């Protein structure tokens, strides 16, 4: 049997001591395995069920723990307790990820990066579920399943499909801003430590007086922005597909703690009402010249997970997890995510995923009437009442936590989104005014490399969108793809419906 080499005795999952973990119970030295070898059966059965469903998006990720510290007074904007005083620290857990790839995909893939922060506050958990880009591809959640399908694998070939990818985007002009960011070098960050994080959505802050404000979050990396070129990303993807995961873990392990400065953009309801575009449209940014940022805090990651599955894989973030002082806006995509994230966690982790330690509130006891369900691993409410109202001392609502009201109006209907905000202006401004010559050269090269694999009719349709954003932008892509620039310009002058008909198969 060999000598015992540990003070700990190996047991089954139920705490029963194990005498031998190397040899199955058999009939004789070379005989068949006996069905009564319950240790073997238990070990194999647990192994058979080790894998849980991977996330439908953001499957590949890394995470770490740390803290958030307030550095500015924001009490006139929000009554959130974790933001109530300068110097206050709140424990956090952060998960970074790619979006479209599977769990084993490369960290260097051209893809937005998830940037999700869980704040363990005294009023429960607050989840800020953002990306490393300030905008997104679509503004209506009804389009989200279709969009994600195009970013994954062809249902027939099971391969990534440039036709699917670009067909959807070229038929969805609102995506042009995010596409321009994605195919810049910011679409391939060097590491998770060298990228920013954004709420992307507009959220609502409200104070003790019941006044509310619209806000956006910007986590600016203190390590500096560093990106990979197309060639660098492809090389690293082949030689070290887990490079960003490893980089984060090793930096924290040696005490080189990454940090981000939280900057906020804040707008009054009156400013929003009169602004030149819909400030809740996730395909747009708020110009910093109109709404400068305000530094309010510091995010620091100083603790590696002790077990990846327990903390990172089982971590579940939801934009529905809001604490008093913070609310959602009428952003359509945000309202869709408020449902969808919680729903997918139930599928992946079960209805009691909030009891998993990484997801459980640490500084605010859970006092709800939720009971039973798979993996209810706490006292399940004990002998207390499981309904409200009751007269047996159960927890009761408190109106002090109600959000202040705000007005909404309109006829209920499925209507085309309309607003005087051209979908191409900000993409053009980004190309002309923000990017350098080097940035523009890489952007065009990255697009041509990927779009060239799609059908020519799709190339023409998508290049027309680049042309609408900026003439030079579209012309350079057309040249790289060897397209007729006159045909591109003709398509650019059409409506979206006309352009779709003109480029049908």
Swiss-Prot record:
GO molecular function list: catalase activity; heme binding; metal ion binding
Biological source species: Methanosarcina barkeri (strain Fusaro / DSM 804)
UniProt keyword annotation of Iron-sulfur present: no
Keyword Iron: yes
Keywords, alphabetical: Heme, Hydrogen peroxide, Iron, Metal-binding, Oxidoreductase, Peroxidase
Substrates-to-products reaction catalysed: 2 H2O2 = O2 + 2 H2O
Family: Belongs to the catalase family.
Binding site for heme: 341
Protein name: Catalase
Function comment: Decomposes hydrogen peroxide into water and oxygen; serves to protect cells from the toxic effects of hydrogen peroxide.
EC nos: 1.11.1.6
Active site: 58, 131
One record GO biological process: response to hydrogen peroxide
GO CC annotations, alphabetized: cytoplasm
InterPro entries with a match to the protein in the record: Catalase, Catalase_3, Catalase_AS, Catalase_clade1/3, Catalase_core, Catalase_haem_BS, Catalase_immune_responsive, Catalase_sf
């Amino acid at each position: 049997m060999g000598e015992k080499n540990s003070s700990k005795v190996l047991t089954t999952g139920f705490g029963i001591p194990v005498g031998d973990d190397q040899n199955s119970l058999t009939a004789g030295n070379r005989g068949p395995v006996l069905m009564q070898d319950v240790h073997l059966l238990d070990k194999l059965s647990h192994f058979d069920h080790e894998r849980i469903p991977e996330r439908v998006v953001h499957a590949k990720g890394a995470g770490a723990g740390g803290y958030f510290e307030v550095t500015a007074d924001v009490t006139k904007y929000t009554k959130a307790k974790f933001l109530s005083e300068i110097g206050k620290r709140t424990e956090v857990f952060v998960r970074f990820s790619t979006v479209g790839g599977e769990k084993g995909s490369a960290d260097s893939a051209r893809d937005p990066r998830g940037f999700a922060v869980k704040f363990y506050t005294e009023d429960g958990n607050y989840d800020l579920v953002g990306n490393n880009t300030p905008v997104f591809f679509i503004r209506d959640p009804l389009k989200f399943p279709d969009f994600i399908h195009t970013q994954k694998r062809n249902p027939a070939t099971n391969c990534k499909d440039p036709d699917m990818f670009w067909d959807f985007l070229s038929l969805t002009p609102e995506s042009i801003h995010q596409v321009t960011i994605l195919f810049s070098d910011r679409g391939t960050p060097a590491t998770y430590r060298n990228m920013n994080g954004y709420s992307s959505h507009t959220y609502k802050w409200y104070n003790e007086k019941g006044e509310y404000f619209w806000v956006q979050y910007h986590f600016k990396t203190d390590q500096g922005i560093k990106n990979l070129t197309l060639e660098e990303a492809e090389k690293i993807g082949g030689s070290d597909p887990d490079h960003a995961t490893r980089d984060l873990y090793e930096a924290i392990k040696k005490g080189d703690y990454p940090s981000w400065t939280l900057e906020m953009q804040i707008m009054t309801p009156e400013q929003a009402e009169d602004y030149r575009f819909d400030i809740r449209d996730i395909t747009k940014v708020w110009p910093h010249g109109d709404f400068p940022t305000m530094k309010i805090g510091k995010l620091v990651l100083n603790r590696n997970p002790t077990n990846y599955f327990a903390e990172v894989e089982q971590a579940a973030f939801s934009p529905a997890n809001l604490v008093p002082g913070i609310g959602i806006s009428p952003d359509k995509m945000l309202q869709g995510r408020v449902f969808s994230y919680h729903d997918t966690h139930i599928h992946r982790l079960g209805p009691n995923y909030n009891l998993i330690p990484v997801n459980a509130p640490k500084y605010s006891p859970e006092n709800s009437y939720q009971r039973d369900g798979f993996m209810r691993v706490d006292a399940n409410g004990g002998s207390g009442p499981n309904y409200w109202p009751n007269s047996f001392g159960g927890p009761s609502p408190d109106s002090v936590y109600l959000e202040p009201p705000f007005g909404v109006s309109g006829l209920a209907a499925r209507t085309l989104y309309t607003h005087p905000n051209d979908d191409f202006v900000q993409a053009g401004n980004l190309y002309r005014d923000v990017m350098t010559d080097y940035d523009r050269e890489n952007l065009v090269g990255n697009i041509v490399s990927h779009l060239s694999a799609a059908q020519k009719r799709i190339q023409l349709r998508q290049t027309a969108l680049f042309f609408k954003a900026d003439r030079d932008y579209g012309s350079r892509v057309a040249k790289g793809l060897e397209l007729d620039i006159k045909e591109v310009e003709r398509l650019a002058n059409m409506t979206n419906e006309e352009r779709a008909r003109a480029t049908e198969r």
